[in-house]
């Protein structure tokens, strides 16, 4: 087994609309990497499906939103993590109120912090979760920035903020006109893409890369074996071989880029 990372790498994966395969890509990428390296991997779930995908449902519901709605220190976020496999954990979305409204349990501002500052603190806490942190963003908000964050910030704003804050973010997308159109309307950039390729689509890999203005780092063939593995709850123990190989290659590529991005971010902060 090899250790790939030299510093903490945080990668955000997201889709321009539902049904693109983001959560399955994140889970598969994490599973493939922990099997081939000594790195610890944490998934931060902003979409809400990871515990079910990874067979960790019913254990606890406390997670990211609950941490945001408290004044807990960064270390408390790690304590919400569910153990999925050796060196693999998932921090659930949870059920707290990120809006700052009074929920009867102190709201978002018990320590006098607004939502924007608390969300900034979340990214600092995420940095300490594992060697590799994969953020399952889901579908970010179409809003261009956060308006009056202490009063109106919600889970959708959190997802958009995750994309904007990531040193390395990857869009998972099908060669679908509507998905590409939606991407353009979000006014977000991506560093690279994972293309979920379906048969008989008119748009090519090159068309997708041109529209995104970013390279396609991996192509995942639509495979019934993946759906069977997910539907049977066997993704952790029976990751389909073709998907496993694709995710292993993607992990090597993303982690090299992610280490470089993290180093650049550190140099920028130091400057």
Region annotations inferred by a language model:
Residues 117-232:
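Conserved catalytic-core segment of NTP-binding enzymes
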Residues 76-95, 101-128, 135-137, 142, ...:
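Flexible loop/N-cap segments at domain edges
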Residues 34-90:
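Phosphate-binding loop that captures ATP/GTP phosphates
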Residues 6-56, 119, 126:
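Walker A/P-loop phosphate-binding motif and the immediately C-terminal alpha-helix
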Residues 228-251:
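C-terminal boundary of histidine-terminating zinc-finger modules
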Residues 8-10, 62-81, 177, 239, ...:
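N-terminal regions of ATP-driven nucleic-acid and macromolecular assemblies
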Residues 1-10, 216:
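Short boundary/hinge segments that flank catalytic cores
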Residues 193-196, 219-225, 238, 254-271:
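P-loop NTP-binding site
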């Amino acid at each position: 087994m090899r250790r790939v990372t030299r510093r903490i790498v945080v990668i955000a994966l997201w889709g321009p609309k539902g049904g693109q395969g983001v959560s399955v890509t994140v889970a598969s990428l994490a599973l493939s990497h922990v099997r081939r390296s000594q790195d610890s991997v944490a998934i931060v779930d902003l979409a809400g499906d990871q515990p079910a995908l990874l067979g960790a449902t019913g254990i606890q519901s406390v997670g990211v939103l609950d941490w945001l709605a408290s004044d807990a220190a960064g270390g408390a976020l790690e304590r919400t993590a569910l153990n999925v496999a050796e060196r693999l954990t998932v921090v659930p979305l949870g059920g707290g109120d990120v809006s700052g409204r009074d929920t009867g349990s102190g709201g978002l501002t018990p320590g006098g912090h607004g939502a924007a500052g608390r969300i900034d603190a979340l990214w600092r806490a995420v940095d300490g979760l594992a060697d590799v942190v994969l953020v399952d963003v889901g579908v970010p908000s179409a809003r261009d920035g956060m308006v009056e964050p202490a009063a109106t910030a919600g889970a959708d704003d959190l997802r958009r903020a995750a994309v904007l804050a990531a040193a390395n973010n990857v869009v998972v997308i099908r060669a679908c006109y509507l998905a590409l159109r939606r991407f353009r309307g979000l006014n977000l950039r991506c560093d690279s893409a994972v293309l979920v390729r379906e048969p008989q689509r008119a748009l090519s890999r090159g068309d997708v890369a041109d529209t995104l203005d970013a390279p396609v780092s991996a192509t995942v063939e639509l495979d019934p074996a993946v759906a069977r593995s997910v539907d049977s709850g066997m993704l952790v123990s029976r990751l389909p071989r073709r998907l496993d190989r694709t995710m292993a290659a993607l992990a090597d590529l993303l982690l090299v880029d992610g280490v470089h991005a993290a180093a650049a971010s550190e140099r920028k902060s130091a400057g």
